[in-house]
Amino acid sequence: MLNVGDKVKMNDKYYVSDVNKEKIFTVTAGPQEVGGTLCVWLEDYRGCYAVDGLSKVN
């Protein structure tokens, strides 16, 4: 489970643009269900992102 403050990267489950492929994001809010999908909000990312499309980094 992801928590506020966790560092994450987008994995290959969904399409990821070249700009975001290696970028490390910080979880700012969530998780919450959006349209039936569990999502979190990320710093410097517009909108929320599906939890299963993210991998936690150390």
Stretch-by-stretch model annotation:
Residues 7-57:
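Basic/aromatic-rich interaction segments and small domains that mediate binding to polyanionic partners
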